[in-house]
A protein has these predicted regions:
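Non-catalytic propeptide/linker segments at domain boundaries
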Residues: 1-15
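Active-site mouth of glycoside hydrolases
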Residues: 13-307, 319
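Surface-exposed loop/edge segments in extracytoplasmic proteins
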Residues: 661-669
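Flexible internal linker/loop segments at domain or repeat junctions
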Residues: 319-337, 616-624
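C-terminal beta-strand-rich structural cap/linker in extracellular carbohydrate-active enzymes
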Residues: 671-686
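Long, low-hydrophobicity ectodomains and other hydrophilic envelope-associated domains
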Residues: 437, 446-648, 652-656, 677
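Generic recognition of flexible, low-complexity loop/linker segments
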Residues: 159-161, 258, 270-273, 296-300, ...
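Catalytic-core region of carbohydrate-active enzymes that cleave or remodel glycosidic bonds
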Residues: 154, 263-283, 290-291, 298-317, ...
Length: 686
């Protein structure tokens, strides 16, 4: 198949040693060669034997995937080790390895666990509640948790006899998924009394070490007390997170300092435990957001520096509401069609919001990963996603983009018992992986200049002074007047988040005075015209219209509102289409520029929808689902013309390919390519 990218992967994962970190990048330890990961969360639960996994691995390699994040519990409903899960994970690693795909292991998520009322080592739960935060302070839980890792990493495979501990195809491990002391779930309503008493006693002990006594601590706080404060038992309670990051009292600062130290120590001790087992792969702490991106966000990231790289999660959602809308799409649900290329708010009737998961500052010269991300269904603009991630991931020199979720290896609208909003195996998503994976993995878009260097003083962060560049914090268009206009950032100002669409940002945590070195962004960002140009000159975004133009030597194209864009003249090609929403991109397959390449892929996509899906308009920006639809997927008929400018364009043969990348017939030459309504890929050769 002309779209088969298996050749990008190693002969087998680990061929060049374990994945390591050097100079802020992932590298092959044996060669020192940098590597980026275009990845998926998966495989799904459909595979029950090695053959299923091997077929899935071959499919993923074809579409440019070189890493899977296998997100699966290794424990049963009581928190005891499940040996079958260990065997399944081993089978996944072995199958992926054969196709040059690494595996990243994620085995604990609080939402997978609901301790029963009489649980022997997690007291106080009711069989319905999740143990948020408990892993970070409960020693019995930590001992059990470490037993899970010991069993998973040291049990020999029944197939190969190898331990995962010794397997270079294991990219790394994640300490915990989506939990933090600084997220809203850390609240007395979510933590039972028996567990609160444990951590309140720890806080009391911490305060005694700092102040000499609890009386002295309360005096330093002007005597303010909470109902749960019990000094006679050495216990001190916690104010709600909202109060901490808004009121920033002396008590709040002490509380945050204690929680930060406890969370960081948990990560440090877990890393030490895993290294003590002999684990040679990478370790990351967690990936969660916080109740305050401005105040708690940088502290969360600072706690993650105990690991080898910094991870995060982020979804581009679509105002989806209804019963169980957090994990399913059902009749009666409502949603909005929302364009990321226009920075539309979840409700597009509201002002633009300049926030997106692709925004990726690098912390402490460590690699970055986004281990869960997607544009959620049923948004018609979902087809913007693959090129958006690839282009801006490459511009910011992001190290790993892990799409959520590969929930089945068939092109089905409903892979499981319900229709979910993250399904990756769709024409608009996986169908655009060939060109997107090439752009990202091969660096066909150059990294941008470093436009901001931010030094955050650790003591200031613990003093709740925050950061001028909060990650995952929405800034609406009405606030753009408040961003710095030159190179000076005044206290309280936010750096323009559009900086991420122009170049790179580095953040360091320091002991010396904090500072911000900011480039003048006026040559890249034009708020009046609503445009952003990359510092490389290869990318331009017209966010007023919703059009992305890519003009790099080895990758050129246009994405978004093609009809509104009109004829688009790029360096080596000309594109014209009346599609309201479309994505047309050419990439070279021989590492030569478009101007001289002898082998190119032209990839075309518009929007997808399920057959028989029906909606009704609730208001101008909100729709209600009448019928979620059925198989098969449909793609809007494609339309347009692509002309290559090079002198030998008429000598370049153009072959239309089917959906699997196999030739179906000649369609002339590259002097003028009239797009066929049902063709997504064209091979251009000489």
């Amino acid at each position: 198949s002309a779209i088969d990218l298996r050749r990008l992967n190693e002969k087998f994962a680990g061929e060049h040693g374990f994945i390591a970190v050097a100079s802020g990048q992932f590298v092959h330890s044996a060669s020192g060669q940098p590597v980026r990961f275009w990845a998926v969360n998966g495989p799904s639960g459909e595979g029950r034997d090695g053959g299923d996994f091997r077929r899935t691995a071959r499919l993923l390699a074809k579409y440019g995937v070189n890493l899977v994040r296998h997100h699966r519990a290794v424990f049963d409903k009581d928190g005891e080790l499940n040996p079958e899960s260990v065997r399944r994970i081993q089978a996944v690693v072995e199958a992926m390895k054969a196709e040059g795909i690494y595996t990243h292991l994620s085995i604990y998520f609080p939402l997978w666990f609901t301790p029963r009322a009489d649980h022997p080592w997690l007291k106080g739960y009711d069989g319905k509640s999740h143990p948020f935060a408990a892993l970070m302070f409960n020693p019995d839980f930590q001992a059990k948790y470490r037993g899970w890792w010991r069993a998973l990493l040291t049990t020999p495979s029944e197939t190969t006899g190898r331990r995962l501990l010794d397997e270079p195809a294991v990219f790394g491990v994640e300490v915990q998924n989506e939990d933090s002391f600084f997220f809203w779930t850390f609240d007395a309503k979510n933590i039972p009394d028996e567990q609160l008493r444990l951590i309140e006693k720890m806080f009391g002990d911490w305060l005694r070490r700092k102040y000499g006594s609890l009386d002295a601590a309360f005096a330093a706080w002007d005597g303010a007390k909470l109902n749960r404060d019990t000094p006679a038992e050495g216990r001190v309670a916690f104010r709600p997170l909202w109060n901490m990051f808004n009121e920033k009292t002396a008590r709040d600062k002490d509380t945050v300092c204690f929680l930060f130290e406890l969370q960081t120590r948990f990560y440090q001790e877990t890393v030490a435990f895993l290294r003590g087992l002999g684990f040679k792969g990478l370790i990351t702490a967690s990936n969660w957001s916080t109740a305050s991106p401005e105040v708690f966000g940088p502290l969360e990231k600072l706690s993650y520096t105990a690991g080898d790289f910094i991870d995060r999660h982020g979804y581009f959602e679509c105002n989806h509401k209804g019963d169980n809308a957090a994990w399913s799409i059902r009749n009666g649900h409502t949603y909005s069609d929302r364009s990321a290329l226009r920075f539309e708010a979840p409700d597009p009737a509201k002002p633009r919001q300049f926030v997106h998961p692709v925004m990726d500052p690098h912390y402490d010269n460590k690699p970055s990963m986004i281990s869960e991300t997607t544009f959620c269904r049923p948004n018609r603009y979902r087809s913007e996603a693959p090129l958006y991630y690839a282009v801006y991931g490459a511009l910011q020199d992001s190290d790993a983009i892990v799409h959520f979720a590969f929930d089945g290896s068939r092109w089905g609208v409903k892979p499981n018992f319900w229709m979910q909003q993250w399904t990756l195996m769709t024409p608009a998503m996986m169908g655009q992986f060939p060109a997107a994976a090439l752009i990202y993995r091969r660096g066909l878009v150059s990294p941008g200049q470093v436009l901001a260097e931010i030094k955050l003083n650790k003591a200031d962060l613990l003093g709740l002074k925050g950061t001028p560049l909060p990650q995952d914090a929405a800034l609406d268009e009405l606030r753009l007047a408040d961003v710095p206009r030159g190179v000076e950032v005044k206290p309280g100002q936010r750096i323009d988040p559009l900086i991420h669409y122009a170049g790179r940002v580095n953040v360091q945590f320091v002991d010396e005075a904090g500072s911000t070195k900011l480039a003048d962004l006026t040559s890249f960002v034009d708020h009046a015209k609503r445009t952003v140009t990359s510092s490389t000159g290869e990318i331009s975004l017209d966010y007023g219209t919703g059009v992305l133009r890519l003009n790099a030597p080895c990758a050129q194209g246009v994405s978004g509102a093609l009809k509104a864009a009109g004829p688009v003249d790029l360096k080596d090609m000309h594109v014209n289409s009346s599609l309201e929403l479309g994505h047309i991109v050419a990439v070279t397959l021989d590492d030569q520029p478009l101007a001289t390449s002898r082998l190119l892929l032209l990839q075309v996509m518009t929007e997808e929808r399920e057959s028989n899906r029906q909606t009704e308009q609730v208001n101008p920006t909100v729709k209600r689902i009448v019928s979620i639809g059925t198989d098969p997927w449909q793609v809007r008929a494609l339309e347009g013309t692509v002309r290559f400018k090079r002198a030998d364009a008429a000598m370049l043969k153009v072959t239309a390919l089917d959906f699997n990348g196999y030739a179906v017939g000649s369609v002339g030459n590259a002097d003028e390519i009239r797009l066929q309504k049902n063709t997504l890929y064209y091979l251009i050769s000489r």
